[in-house]
Amino acid sequence: MGSEMEPLLRAWSYFRRRKFQLCADLCTQMLEKSPYDQEPAPDLPVSQAAWILKARALTEMVYIDEIDVDQEGIAEMILDENAIAQVPRPGTSLKLPGTNQTGGPTQAVRPITQAGRPITGFLRPSTQSGRPGTMEQAIRTPRTAYTARPITSSSGRFVRLGTASMLTSPDGPFINLSRLNLTKYSQKPKLAKALFEYILHHENDVKMALDLASLSTEYSQYKDWWWKVQIGKCYYRLGMYREAEKQFKSALKQQEMVDTFLYLAKVYIILDQPVTALNLFKQGLDKFPGEVTLLCGIARIYEEMNNSSSAAEYYKEVLKQDNTHVEAIACIGSNHFYSDQPEVALRFYRRLLQMGVYNCQLFNNLGLCCFYAQQYDMTLTSFERALSLAENEEEAADVWYNLGHIAVGIGDTNLAHQCFRLALVHNNHHAEAYNNLAVLEMRKGHVEQARALLQTASSLAPHMYEPHFNFATVSDKIGDLQRSYVAAQKSEVAFPEHVDTQHLIKQLKQHFAML
């Protein structure tokens, strides 16, 4: 079949079937017949088509969807020169954790991240970290659940300049960018678009891509919305958010597209204007009713603003439009679990299992839901599956930690002790396991060991209130009132509504007043 097809048609077929390497190799063979493959021959349309197709194939091999995947690196967080209001009005900022005024589960029930927001049901880039207050916190914050190392710069996920291009052919790069006459290419719209994407995504030369986009926009007399979106993307990568905002707004006036709404919302989110982003998404929904990506964007913002009830409503709207949306199902399931409805959560996680999601996290959640819904026959088998599917040490540590909770629930403290120790063997930065192990040691009467474990837990996770409160309680019992008071204050900072902490502080103040 292959020998009967024309080479260009076969290359196009490979491209459509996402066999990009085969497509690029075939285009290379076709271009080798002409003396130079640096630029397409003007009188040979086949050569020109092969050149464009090869550029597109090489771009697709390293292409990243920039709408969803967005990670702020340490460099972007700490060295950010954009001035943002330090004391924003409540409910208008993503940088400060909002208070839970929506009737959702409190911090005592639902664990929170370092940024002060509840842990989401679906791991997304940047949901783990938020914006750290200090460099030390930034370095300590894991980039995702899979690695403890923070991303140092957002450019780290883009291919290094020249690296990918050198790999594509042994003779050197496919296109020698320094020799390109951008003005000539900007006058050929079809060529210019393929070349722009190659320069931006494959070569990661944002400045040259911006130059080409500016010349092409000028040539189109500022009437082509596509080029305005691309200029906005370049400005966003360069950290020029206000300029990016202008370009995206101008593109939306000419042609309303879902992607443009999403790019503009990203700009508002990084400028810490979630309310503006919400209004923009709602404008988008007026133009594109029921669009899943816009509904999901609204739900994510509400979730980050600690408004779990509104987030759940929008995730339900997402499921009405697309009933196989994994993120929406996982987030609604998580919300039901922490709202003391494990049976309902179990239905959502089983739905994920039916859809073909088969990983450690899902079986871990199924095991917990089965236990709290009193379906004990399925609990341990789910955790066994989770352990067998764990891809790294952190995942195994989380499974052992949850098994420790099951052991506490059935009253087997020895098993719980072993499970928490195994969690620490797999991940010795697991603050929750240190805290729970300290409680078990305290019950055995090992006070000093419990205090040491609690100090470790509070230093690893200063945003958690439990280690601080437990340390304050232990110190109070052995008469170390000063340390007890300091720890209780830290607990109050972490969780101001915690009644037991307030009682302890009041009691300690009475002690100090009597001295």
From Swiss-Prot:
GO terms for biological process: axon guidance; camera-type eye photoreceptor cell differentiation; cilium assembly; establishment of anatomical structure orientation; establishment of epithelial cell apical/basal polarity; establishment of planar polarity; fat cell differentiation; inner ear receptor cell stereocilium organization. Coiled coil: none annotated. Residues 89-109, 118-137 are annotated as: Disordered. The keyword Repeat applies. PROSITE patterns: TPR (PS50005), TPR_REGION (PS50293). GO terms for cellular component: BBSome; centriolar satellite; centriole; ciliary basal body; ciliary membrane; cilium; cytoplasm; fibrillar center. Transmembrane segments: none annotated. TPR repeats lie at residues 4-37, 225-258, 259-291, 292-325, 326-359, 360-393, 397-430, 432-464. Isoform 1 is retina-specific whereas isoform 2 is ubiquitously expressed. Its main location: cytoplasm. Keywords: Cell membrane, Cell projection, Cilium, Cilium biogenesis/degradation, Cytoplasm, Cytoskeleton, Membrane, Protein transport, Repeat, TPR repeat, Transport. Pfam families: TPR_16, TPR_8. It is found in: Cytoplasm, Cytoskeleton, Microtubule organizing center, Centrosome, Centriole; Cell projection, Cilium membrane; Cytoplasm; Cytoplasm, Cytoskeleton, Microtubule organizing center, Centrosome, Centriolar satellite. The keyword Cytoplasm applies. GO terms for molecular function: RNA polymerase II-specific DNA-binding transcription factor binding. SMART domains: TPR. Part of BBSome complex, that contains BBS1, BBS2, BBS4, BBS5, BBS7, BBS8/TTC8, BBS9 and BBIP10. Interacts with PCM1. Interacts with CCDC28B. Interacts with PKD1. The BBSome complex is thought to function as a coat complex required for sorting of specific membrane proteins to the primary cilia. The BBSome complex is required for ciliogenesis but is dispensable for centriolar satellite function. This ciliogenic function is mediated in part by the Rab8 GDP/GTP exchange factor, which localizes to the basal body and contacts the BBSome. Rab8(GTP) enters the primary cilium and promotes extension of the ciliary membrane. This is Tetratricopeptide repeat protein 8. It comes from Mus musculus.
